[in-house]
Amino acid sequence: MNLGIPLELALILFSVNPTFDEMTKAKEWITASLGEESYAVPFSFNYGEQSSGNFIKTWKKEYSSEKLDENRTKHTIKFSDPDTHLEIRMESIVYSDFPAVEWVLYFKNNGSSDTPILDNILPLDIGFSGDKNYKLHYAKGALCCIDDFAPMEKTFGVGDSIHLQPGGGRSSSEFMPFFNLDMGIEGILIAIGWTGEWSATFNCDSEKNLQAKAGMALTHLKLHPSEEIRTPRIMMMFWKGEHTRGNNLLRRFILSHHRPKPNNTPLVLPIILSDWGGASADHHLEIIQRIIKNNLPIEYYWIDAEWFGKMPWHENAGNWEVRKELYPQGFKPISDMLHQSGRKFLLWFEPQRVCKGTPWYELKNRPNWLLELGDGTPEYKQRGINWGISHEDPRWIIYESRRNQIAENDMLLNIGEPEARKFLTDFLSDKVVEFGLDCYREDFNIAPLEYWRHADTSDRQGMTEIRYIESLYDMWDELLQRHPHLMIDNCASGGRRIDLETISRSTALWRTDWPADSLHKQCHSYGLFQWVPLHTTAGAVAENEYDLRSSMTAGLMVQFGSDDEKTRAILDQYLKIQKYFYGDYYPLTEYNTSRDVCMAWQFDYPEIGEGMVQAFRRENSSQESIKLYPKALDADAMYTMNNLDTSASDEMTGKELMENGFVVNTKNQPGSSIIVYKKSVNKDRDYYFDGRISREVLENYLSRSITMMDLLSG
């Protein structure tokens, strides 16, 4: 693509991209750890009761590389044991547009007999030396609480350590699988791609050396002849400056390289309206007709659970017959009406949990198709859809994370069994066609870990989980290949399977099961924005401006009120600012769950010299005004600040804004303010406003429809 942009202009435009120092740091580490001559590998394992560090240098090593595209090069390193014929294949991807590298390990038995035991396989095992001030930034997971995704910190002194894992086998239950290791003026982002039970440990020794280890929480297994397994994916990214820069590099990296692409177009999240599946088709059609009649900018219509089997929904997963009393003609009349108006259809499923008494429960007669819980942990067996305890009870977190049943005798469809995976893939693929689906919503309301471990034998611990997770990725990939238009909504009790692998294929449109009110939504956004750019939360009534603004993310879910004109106005306002949610994120206040404070954040798009600040005055806050200090502005540039509510406008330099701050007044209690800022035109500096680059071209870059290389090719 030739956009007619001078090279020097493109370099000015994208000066916010990774620095030379960051790219150099990454290159040095990659050469030392992944180079053709290096044996200083970033992984470890035990084999036959010996640590890999004691023998890996004696194994045969092969190296190859392959350029995948303009920004990615694949490096493959193979280590082979001459005695047992075990082969380890490390496939890494090195990025030329980010200071990042990621890798997966594969273990294959090329021998004619079982291997010795492979134990404690850690695809990440690296050390950092020197007297540095280590601080780990990480986040809580999604546990149906007000502090879901809350930012966490751990400062390391001599002898300090921290061990993290999600609990229950869903990757973002108790903790998120993203970490920012801050070393003062530089640091490393670490992300794990494993939709099961990962673990991560950080330990500081007596000489202030820090060791970081991550992998599956349990591996103790032998491989049969010709058998192969994979590990969790590990991503590392190097940054310099403040740790918020590292998090923003991660956001940009995800948008560039780990973003779903329906119809080969980078995903921009829609405005969605949802309703319950237990309502009738006539009810849904009436709502859709209202959307069409009033030309509301709602792109997706979402039908949730209870459209199948019998009531209640949580006791009928496994009976996927459409309820004819509600939908006598199925879903095609609904999807047809949506498609004819240029809109799309989303439908809920939970196909991996199988309830007793449903047709799929009979699949237990097929060997290894359904996994049993065994004795399980009695405290983790939920009956109904609540625990009978408050969210503040310390037992809540453990019970929610590790819930192994909702309905008595729940079983787990074992997609790790090839025929079972094919059965489910074909079933879902058929429903995409039959129902006219544009988005497949996959829920997953039980923690699978105890099912997996109950199925393992003592010399194959971890194998059931490995096969299950491998097959989950294979199934999603095949669905996306068969139906290139399809979007996958990854729910899992609200946001409990968010990791580097899932966000590449799916999006969490319901990021937590506890979006109780505006306060909760603000707290959830504050935390999750720092790590993952694409997600949405529960819908707000469109006329409730405070709640709707608290719900705004890279996409938006709404519910109808009574005034369609007001609904259109606020949705139009959202569409004007939606692009900023794809920019760099900066918290401007401390994280706080209290109702008597204000919370604010900033989204900045330096590529176009624009951004916005959102401020929320909570219901018990006495602060009518708050002074905020935006980040990452051009100190010498002049900015115009526009308040979308009052139409008030002001001009200040970037330096004045960052050093002296500006005051936001919010009279309503509760209330919110949105301030949009824009660099003033200066043709000596702001070349991209002088007509040589259209706004359309810039916004194509922001949505990643084109790459930086497209610009540089001019």
Please give the residue ranges for each predicted region.
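Active-site-proximal substrate-binding groove within the catalytic cores of carbohydrate-active enzymes
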Residues: 18, 231, 446, 472-650, ...
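C-terminal beta-strand-rich structural cap/linker in extracellular carbohydrate-active enzymes
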Residues: 652-697, 701, 706-709
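Polysaccharide-binding surfaces and accessory modules of carbohydrate-active proteins
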Residues: 16-203, 207, 217-219, 638-646
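Conserved, mostly hydrophobic/aromatic
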Residues: 105, 226, 301, 338, ...
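Short Pro-Gly-centered flexible turn/kink motifs
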Residues: 221-240, 670-678
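Solvent-exposed beta-strand/loop surfaces of large extracellular or lumenal domains
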Residues: 201-212, 643-663
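Aromatic-lined carbohydrate-binding/catalytic grooves of carbohydrate-active enzymes
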Residues: 266-426, 439, 451
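Active-site neighborhood of glycoside hydrolase catalytic domains
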Residues: 323, 327-330, 334, 374-545, ...
